[in-house]
Amino acid sequence: MDIDPYKEFGATVELLSFLPSDFFPSVRDLLDTASALYREALESPEHCSPNHTALRQAILCWGELMTLASWVGNNLEDPASREQVVNYVNTNMGLKIRQLLWFHISCLTFGRETVLEYLVSFGVWIRTPPAYRPPNAPILSTLPETAVVRRRGRSPRRRTPSPRRRRSQSPRRRRSQSPASQC
């Protein structure tokens, strides 16, 4: 199966691969960030958003992977084999988890559209030959934040903007007042 964990969010594995591996913070830093910003929503039995669900699943997968890695590390007697397992997990699996955590934390913090715009901007920047691109890459934190903090409980009322009334280009007409309306 060819499963792309970003597809339902409008991104792709390829789009995230434009960001260099050293761009993503450590798993520990990302877990601390997720906990500090979204602990209540992540631990809640209520469904908050698809990003919360994906973030929750990535955190659980990382925990299971660490349990497996610890078990393998404790049961492999050959130090070279143990080192290979640790390096593989940190290099390959760790990068995928760091990308997932970063993507969903960023979507919750900045908004999905802003993150997608950033990924496309960075992808264009990195593929442009150095002589023709600005010296600095786009920075996500300089884009406007769109995060909305919601309280648990009732979902907020959605308000649609009222349509703007078009003003006539002709001068305003005054209503003539009838004698009966001058009470």
Curated annotation (Swiss-Prot):
Biological-process GO terms, alphabetical: microtubule-dependent intracellular transport of viral material towards nucleus; symbiont entry into host cell; viral penetration into host nucleus
Region (3 X 8 AA repeats of S-P-R-R-R-[PR]-S-Q): 155-177
Protein name: Capsid protein
Sequence repeats: 155-161, 162-169, 170-177
Lineage of the organism: Viruses, Riboviria, Pararnavirae, Artverviricota, Revtraviricetes
Amino acid composition bias (Basic residues), ranges on this chain: 149-176
Compartments reported by the entry: Virion; Host cytoplasm
Pfam families named among the record's database cross-references: Hepatitis_core
InterPro entries in the record: Hepatitis_core, Viral_capsid_core_dom_sf_HBV
Record keyword GTP-binding present: no
Family listed: Belongs to the orthohepadnavirus core antigen family.
Organism whose genome encodes this protein: Gorilla hepatitis B virus (isolate Cameroon/gor97)
Subunit-level organization: Homodimerizes, then multimerizes. Interacts with cytosol exposed regions of viral L glycoprotein present in the reticulum-to-Golgi compartment. Interacts with human FLNB. Phosphorylated form interacts with host importin alpha; this interaction depends on the exposure of the NLS, which itself depends upon genome maturation and/or phosphorylation of the capsid protein. Interacts with host NUP153.
Positions of region (Disordered): 143-183
Post-translational modification: Phosphorylated by host SRPK1, SRPK2, and maybe protein kinase C or GAPDH. Phosphorylation is critical for pregenomic RNA packaging. Protein kinase C phosphorylation is stimulated by HBx protein and may play a role in transport of the viral genome to the nucleus at the late step during the viral replication cycle.
GO cellular component, one term: T=4 icosahedral viral capsid
Modification sites for Phosphoserine: 155, 162, 170
Region (RNA binding): 177-183
GO molecular function: DNA binding; RNA binding; structural molecule activity
Gene (UniProt): C
